[in-house]
Amino acid sequence: MNPVLFSLPALVAAPVPPAPEIAVAAVLDDWHRAAAQADEARYFGHLAPEAVFLGTDGTERWDKAAFQAYAHPHFAKGRAWSFKAVKRHIAFAAGGTVAWFDEDLDTPNMGPCRGSGVLELRQGTWKILQYNLSVPIPNALMGEIKTRIAQHKP
């Protein structure tokens, strides 16, 4: 018997871990899908325990527990939110265990949005450490928006 023939099937059948960029994109896509499907456990399972979510309102800086408390009623109703990435850029720190990204989002309720954030590879799983949701404002509208924000009374 030729030992090479017995080794070859083992090499072919061995699972190959996904490329880091594909793995990070898969986590982000599943995170957004979990919100659209109102799967609260799956959604918050993608966040690290110390994660921070920055919302579009200047007052919205939530740690994971506060964000979950805010979001729970939406998930409990069976509808959270729907974000679909239409463009995404992902980069990695030296060592490959920290990634950052920005993504353009299509959202039915808010219109075009942008998300950016940081993930860390922990025990083979990418976890979201920070997510910043923003609404891009065309530069031509900035003066009007700035005035309206100044006039806004919370």
Question: Where are the predicted features?
Answer:
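Short, low-complexity N-terminal intrinsically disordered segments enriched in polar/charged residues
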Residues: 4-49, 140-154
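Surface-exposed, charged secondary-structure patches
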Residues: 16, 52, 66-112
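Generic alpha-helical structural signal
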Residues: 25-29, 65-69, 127
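Hydrophobic pocket/interface hotspot
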Residues: 31, 43-44, 51, 67, ...
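A mature extracytoplasmic/lumenal domain signature
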Residues: 47-48, 57, 87, 94, ...
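A short acidic, helix-capping loop that chelates divalent metal ions and anchors anionic groups
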Residues: 53-55, 139
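Short beta-strand edge/turn micro-motifs at domain boundaries
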Residues: 112-143
